[in-house]
Amino acid sequence: MIERSHHDLRKVFGELLQGDTCKFAASVFDPISVRMAYDLGFDVAIQGGSVASLQVLGAPDIALLTLDEYVEQVSRVGRASQIPIIGDADHGFGNALNVMRTVTELQKAGVAALTLEDTHLPAKYDEQSHVLIEREEAAAKIYAARFARSDDALSIIARTNVAVTTLDDSIARTAAYQKAGADAICLVGVKDFQHLEALTAHLRVPIMLINYGNPALSNVEKLSAANVRIVVNGHAPYLSAIKATYEALREQSGTEGSELSLPELLSKYTLSDSYREWAKTFLKSEHDSN
């Protein structure tokens, strides 16, 4: 097997973005899984931040993972990969200056592209979930990311959640991110092709979708025609690994009784109930200080 350099893989990813076909990204989490993805014919892969949080912390995806922890995880994947890796840069781990550091570190880790989202993370005191930062600040992060990359082949992908704001706001946001120089726009929460058309008619850059297997957005020909070049259908491989690990350990231990479903496993072993209680206690103004 001839190894390709990180720069070469970034060029390959850029060619995917500029091509005319939609590709489904493999959700990978370690060297073996990315080698499997390559062997099975995937052209691109992603190391999800939520998956890294499960791996490293055994915690829900609530912005507990640090930049160093994520970089260490994605570096392992990057060293073994023969296909481009998309890194999940979350919110850039802070403001625009933090974004610059994030880009530098993820570039060294070998990612071919990174997504940078406009969600306010972590949640502030007494703040509802899924709050978006001002689009001017988000656009400044895109400018900063472009400034910080030393390899122009590294793709900067601006990500936004269209399900938590209005159509007009989503259009204004993506237009601003395109103007700021994003190489692609990543959309979360698109309902169907009609919604997709309304959201992207003004865009010239390629589209990436995170749709978690939405059947209304499964037609590859229509996705390709809509300028969608990358689709992420969730992170089933690692979730399946969690389920398989539990079942193997359960069999080895000889434990009897009812088997836990995957949602039950995730809730129990990521301490979800505890984190919810801690959030109610420490992130809400109504908590009792006595």
Curated annotation (Swiss-Prot):
SUPFAM superfamilies: Phosphoenolpyruvate/pyruvate domain. One of its GO terms (biological process) is pyruvate biosynthetic process. One of its GO terms (molecular function) is methylisocitrate lyase activity. It catalyses: oxaloacetate + H(+) = pyruvate + CO2. Transmembrane segments: none annotated. Pfam families: PEP_mutase (PF13714). Keywords: Decarboxylase, Lyase, Magnesium, Metal-binding. Its EC number is 4.1.1.112. Its cofactor is Mg(2+). Substrate binds at residues 50, 159, 235. Binds 1 Mg(2+) ion per subunit. It comes from the Bacteria. Mg(2+) binds at residue 88. Belongs to the isocitrate lyase/PEP mutase superfamily. Oxaloacetate decarboxylase family. Catalyzes the decarboxylation of oxaloacetate into pyruvate. Seems to play a role in maintaining cellular concentrations of bicarbonate and pyruvate. Homotetramer; dimer of dimers. This is Oxaloacetate decarboxylase 2. It comes from Pseudomonas fluorescens (strain Pf0-1). The lineage of its organism: Bacteria, Pseudomonadati, Pseudomonadota, Gammaproteobacteria, Pseudomonadales.
